[in-house]
């Protein structure tokens, strides 16, 4: 399901964080993220969307390409420009490598950037973004499918600890 609690604040760009693909299709978690991003983008048709996610060895396309294909197929009337960040393999890299695209588009880190991810992932993604210098993050949280919610939150708990130990962010910023 899609979070109906979509902020009305205008972002300069929308970063959609990848979350796995299966045989060239977005996972249920990723579909929810893309649907949430599309609902926001429909309100602001000129802002840049950045799809983030690299390629696994067993997939022919990067996550970013699959995400773009899903948006074009599911939301054909959406006219937002889309850029692909297709090298990343982690949340930290999603955000880091997207900065290159933002700079190319003359979008600074002080500008409002919407980061679309899952509800369980939002706090850590926001902390990593702040640590990397993003100064104005608008969190767009997609709901997690009921049948995988427990496992997702449990995995995120350990990722939160790991990220802190690896200095991907500070707990007290």
What are these regions, as identified by a protein language model?
Residues 1-154:
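A structural signal for short, hydrophobic/glycine-enriched beta-strand patches
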Residues 153-172:
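A transmembrane-helix-recognition feature enriched in membrane-embedded lipid enzymes
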């Amino acid at each position: 399901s899609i979070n109906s609690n979509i902020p009305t604040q205008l972002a300069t760009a929308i970063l959609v964080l990848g979350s796995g693909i299966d045989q060239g299709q977005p996972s249920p978690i990723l579909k929810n993220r893309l649907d949430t991003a599309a609902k926001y983008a429909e309100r602001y048709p000129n802002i840049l969307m950045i799809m983030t996610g690299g390629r696994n060895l067993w997939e022919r396309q990067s996550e970013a390409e699959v995400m773009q294909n899903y948006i074009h197929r599911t939301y054909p009337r959406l006219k937002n420009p889309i850029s692909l960040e297709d090298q990343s393999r982690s949340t930290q890299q999603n955000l880091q490598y997207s900065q290159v695209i933002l700079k190319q588009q003359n979008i600074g880190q002080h500008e409002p950037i919407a980061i679309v991810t899952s509800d369980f992932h939002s706090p850590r993604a926001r902390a990593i973004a702040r640590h990397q210098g993003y100064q104005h993050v608008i969190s767009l949280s997609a709901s997690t499918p009921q049948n995988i919610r427990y496992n997702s939150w449990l995995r995120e708990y350990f990722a939160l600890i790991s990220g802190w130990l690896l200095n991907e962010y500070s707990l007290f910023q």
